[in-house]
Amino acid sequence: GLGDVYKRQGGNMQYISKYTSPLGAITLASNGEALTGLWFDGQKYFGANLSKEYKNVELPVFKQTKEWLNLYFNGQKPDFIPLLALQASEFRLAVWQILLEIPYGQTLSYGDISAVLAKQKGLKTMSAQAVGGAVGHNPISIIIPCHRVVGSNGNLTGYAGGLEKKIALLQLEGADMGALFTPKKGTAL
């Protein structure tokens, strides 16, 4: 539930830490108590909410996040989520909350997510493109699993971290790749 996603206004000071994953370098960001960002270095929208000033300090939340990532990259499903602080529109937060609920090793389409949102809001339909924009701007990769979102027909559409990483993450989770395919022309939302 939304209780898992804490919206806390941290101080203005931001902190970063680095993590080396089998898929490349990852940067973690925090407001001092909660995780505010997790990006593959060089990915689209990298550090979108990072201020110019930050300190490289090994905070408790970074230790916890790295423990989560160690378990994850060892093919295990972590049974906890570090404290997250997300600042975004209500719409984006609602989309990211649905992402948190996609089970490990499974996928949902943009259409599935828009149907869930429409139902939540009592609407007939909801734009899958708007959902795509929210998914693409997810600031906490892997933990908020935007890599589990696919196109309506199993098309492995864009992933801010790159399609190779998306495929590698899904394979790591043992997802059924049989019904999924890579678009001829890679598109990232």
Residue ranges and their predicted role:
Residues 1-6:
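Short, small-residue-biased leader/transition segments that mark boundaries at the very start
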Residues 9, 32-33, 43, 173-175:
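Short loop segments at secondary-structure junctions
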Residues 9-10, 186:
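Short hotspots in intrinsically disordered terminal tails
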Residues 10-36:
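DNA-contacting interfaces and partner/effector-binding or oligomerization modules
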Residues 15-25, 67, 76-189:
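Nucleic acid-binding interface residues in structured DNA/RNA-binding domains
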Residues 30-81:
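Compact structured core domains
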